[in-house]
């Protein structure tokens, strides 16, 4: 009986050791953190900080709308297996069809334990006429200062889950935020030199509020957010009437939306569409705008050029 008791203790000890080993994700164990990001922008910021220390899966494909998405079986599997999940929050993946809320519930994941909003700490801007939870404008990353907040939040959670690589994450965070900060300062100087009467960024979706606040360029749009009606005759008429009262030289259309409504606005106002710009997604790998940094630099350059015409 005593021998049986000893064997039982040894067995339980082995199980405990195995459990501890399997739960530890660091360089010494040879196991990488399994990390999921909801879209390509968050995934790219994560990659810049974590490098090859993690296995990373991005849910919403490049070029697709993250407001309303239907997760694939692979997304469900990766989310269930993930050690760490990063999502934007502030009404992006949890608005519309609330696809992310359903995904993490099905995966039995817990907020602020398994999944984290990278927008934590951002000064939230709300949709026009709204000021309540669920009515936030989610496009905070279009202000580079917020992009730096995202990066810091991501690094914080990576370090918490994988402390053995703390110095690696901190060094990458420092280098990355310095790079973003330099671009941010250059952009503010660039937009200061554009005449006030030309300062109006016109897009299909009203997603440039954070950009407008950061760089002093007011914005106008056809529809406010991609979860509502998009490009109705009434929406187009309202924008056309507004633009006829301005001297704005150029229009812009986002890479992830149907460009036909903006083409109608352009025809009705004789204002050309200057460029396609990025909002909800980076570009395909190898193309201009295929990272958060390069998409923001591209946007800033093209918008400044278009408004200087």
Curated annotation (Swiss-Prot):
Residues 1-19 form the signal peptide. InterPro entries: AdhesinB, Bact_metal-bind_prot9, Lipoprotein_PsaA-like, ZnuA-like. A lipid is attached at residue 20 (N-palmitoyl cysteine). GO terms for cellular component: plasma membrane. It is a lipid-anchor. Transmembrane segments: none annotated. Keywords: Cell membrane, Lipoprotein, Manganese, Membrane, Metal-binding, Palmitate, Signal, Transport. Part of the ATP-binding cassette (ABC) transport system PsaABC involved in manganese import. Binds manganese with high affinity and specificity and delivers it to the membrane permease for translocation into the cytoplasm. Also acts as an adhesin which is involved on adherence to extracellular matrix. This is Manganese ABC transporter substrate-binding lipoprotein PsaA. It comes from Streptococcus oralis. The lineage of its organism: Bacteria, Bacillati, Bacillota, Bacilli, Lactobacillales.
């Amino acid at each position: 009986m005593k021998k049986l008791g000893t064997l039982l203790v040894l067995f339980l000890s082995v199980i405990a050791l195995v459990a501890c080993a399997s739960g530890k994700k660091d360089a010494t164990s040879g196991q990488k953190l399994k990390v999921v990001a909801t879209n390509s922008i968050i995934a790219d910021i994560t990659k810049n900080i974590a490098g090859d220390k993690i296995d990373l899966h991005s849910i919403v494909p490049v070029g697709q709308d993250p407001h309303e998405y239907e997760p694939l079986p692979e997304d469900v599997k990766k989310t269930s297996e993930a050690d760490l999940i990063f999502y934007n929050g502030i009404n992006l993946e949890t608005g519309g069809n609330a696809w992310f809320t359903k995904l993490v519930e099905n995966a039995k994941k817990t907020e602020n334990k398994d999944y984290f909003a990278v927008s934590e700490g951002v000064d939230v801007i709300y949709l026009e006429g709204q000021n309540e939870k669920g009515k936030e404008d989610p496009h905070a990353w279009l202000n580079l200062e917020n992009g730096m907040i995202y990066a810091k939040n991501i690094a914080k959670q990576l370090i918490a889950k994988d402390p053995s690589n703390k110095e690696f994450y901190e060094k990458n965070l420092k280098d990355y935020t310095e790079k973003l900060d330099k671009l941010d300062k250059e952009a503010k100087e660039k937009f200061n030199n554009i005449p006030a009467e030309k300062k109006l960024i016109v897009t299909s979706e009203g997603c440039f509020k954070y950009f407008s606040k950061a760089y002093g360029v007011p914005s106008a749009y056809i529809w406010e957010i991609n979860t509502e009606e998009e490009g109705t005759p009434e929406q187009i008429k309202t924008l056309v009437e507004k633009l006829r009262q301005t001297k704005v030289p150029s229009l812009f259309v986002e890479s992830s939306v149907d460009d036909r409504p903006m083409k109608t606005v352009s025809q009705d106002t004789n204002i050309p569409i200057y460029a396609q710009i990025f909002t909800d997604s980076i570009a395909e790998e190898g193309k201009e705008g295929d990272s958060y940094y390069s998409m923001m630099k591209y946007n800033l350059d093209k918008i400044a050029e278009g408004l200087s015409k």
